[in-house]
Amino acid sequence: MDTSQRIFITGVTGYLGSAIATRFVRAGYKVYGLTRNPERAADLTARGIHPVVGTLSNPGTFLPALKNCDAAIHVAFDPTDVVKQDQLALEAVRTGALDGRVRRLIYTSGAWVHGDTGGRVIDESAPLNPIDLVRWRAAHEDVAADLSEHEVKVIVLRPGIVYGGSRGLVGGMFAEAHELRALGYPGGSQYWGMIHRDDLAEAYLRALERGQGGERYLLADGSQLTARQVAEAIAEVTGVQARPRETSEVLKQLGLLGRALLTSQKLNPGRARRELGWTPKHTSFVRDAAELDQEWLATRGTAVA
């Protein structure tokens, strides 16, 4: 892959987008990152990212930059109006292909489009049964795939639950343990398909360089851990007690997100390993929990002992 090519990334200051952008910069690509906050521009520049200040709701703020890029990576997730924002992003990529030079798109979906898998291990061939939180996503995967009609090579990535650093769902569990000196977790027996965000960023790079257009890839570390095992590992390294929360409490507090966290999934990332040459370095959250706790402390700006 020609690393002089230009890559446009949405959500570049977000939990996933920041890690993905950093990995592409390290690989030598010219990265253009969309951010809503002009105050973040200097920080992005210092990290080797060309800041593009704008919003998905106003494509005119970023289309000139997008049209001049060779590939787009859509990672941004705005919970306030996620469906509309996602539609606008895909339409912008279409415009970038018709009127510009965009010829590749990596579209971020998620493993939750497969719904609850129970005790079964699934791969990409499993039927889609999206949970309510992401009910719209399966249709948007198809919209993204249709961009192939405009000579865009489209790859859809379906990550599981991402961990690492201080943000995200699992980062919130570390925060609860440290700040409240207690840890409640949803359910317990349900399986979570875990993936470290650095491994996820590597998968995006491999997908751009090696992925086949039209393919979908599940991304997880293959560890098949339950929510209880994740919570107990955090509790052990932070010195607190972990307790299961009643389902009614989880749903009342978190709504559709709570239902998502109660979803059980066993994911097989074999296709990504075979076709992308992707091998996650972090393969056991439980084994790495102490290191992950130190990573959480460091990224929160706390002195690490």
Language model feature labels by segment:
Residues 175-195, 199:
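A conserved pocket-lining segment of Rossmann-fold NAD(P)-dependent short-chain dehydrogenase/reductase
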Residues 283-305:
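Amphipathic terminal alpha-helices
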Residues 138, 162-174, 206-217, 223:
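Glycine/proline-rich active-site loop of Rossmann-fold NAD(P)-dependent oxidoreductases
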Residues 91-133:
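Conserved Rossmann-fold NAD(P)-dependent oxidoreductase catalytic core, especially the SDR/UDP-sugar
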Residues 35-96:
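NAD(P)H-binding glycine-rich loop region in Rossmannoid oxidoreductase-like domains
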Residues 141-165:
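Conserved beta-loop-beta element that borders a ligand/cofactor-binding pocket
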Residues 7-27:
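N-terminal Rossmann NAD(P)H-binding glycine-rich loop of SDR-like oxidoreductase domains
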Residues 203-257, 297, 302-305:
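Mid/C-terminal beta-alpha module of Rossmann-like enzyme folds, strongest
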